C-alpha cells in the first residue's frame, strides 16, 4: 500500500523548498512521507535550492538583552506567549525583563541553555519575591494572561574582552557576541558590528565561527547532495570533483561567521573586519562565541 500524502505535508514541503506541488507530492511518496528526507530528495534531484533556514514556529513573546556598562557581562532571554496581544502586555514584558535581570545576576552561570527546562534557572529563588521560584513567576504570568507563558531559553556571557549586543528593531532577533583581546571603544564598536551582522542572518545564520565548528555530519550531507547533483548535471566526469569541492567551499563561506561577507560591506569578510579592527587597536582579536535568539525558532 502506497504512502498517503496529505495536502498539508505538500504545503509544508513547498514552503521549505520552493519546489512545485507535484514535485513535492512525488518526493513525499518516494520517501514514505518523511519531510526531512523529502527535502534531501528534492535537493539531490536539483529541484529544490538549499533549504531556507528558519524553523518557523509561530510563537510570540519577548527577547531581552542586558549588557553591563563595561561590556563584560551580558544576558539574553527569550520568553514566549501564545499571541502578540499578550507579548505586548506591559506585565508580560516586565516579566521578561525581570527574568533577564535574574540571569544577568547569576554569577555562577556562563553559557547558553537552549531548552530552559533542562537548565537550573527555573528552580532558582525568584529575586523579586522571596519564597517563590522563577518557575512560580512564569506560572503566575500564565494564570494572569490566560495563555501558556514559557521561558524558552537563556544565555549569560562573562568576558575578559568585550561583549557586543544587538536587538533588531522589531525585537524578534537578538544577539550577543564575545570578543577577546581588548576592551577599547573601537573594539566595542567592532563587537556591535559583528552582533548586528549575525542578527541579519545574511547570507545565512552562521553554523559556527570557523569551519571546524560546523558539524561533520552536516558537511558530509551537503557534500553528498552536491555529488549527486554533479553526477546528474551531465558534465564531464573529470571535473565533477572540482565542482563539488567548489560547492563545499561556498557552503563554508555562507555558513561560517569569519568567512561570511560583512552585511554592511560585501567586499570585506568578517575575518577581515576583525583583523582590521585588531590592527587599529594594536591587539590580536578573537571572536570567541556568540548567541543568537530569534523569536519562536527551534
Language model regions located:
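N-terminal assembly/interaction segments in proteins that build large macromolecular machines
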Residues: 2-298
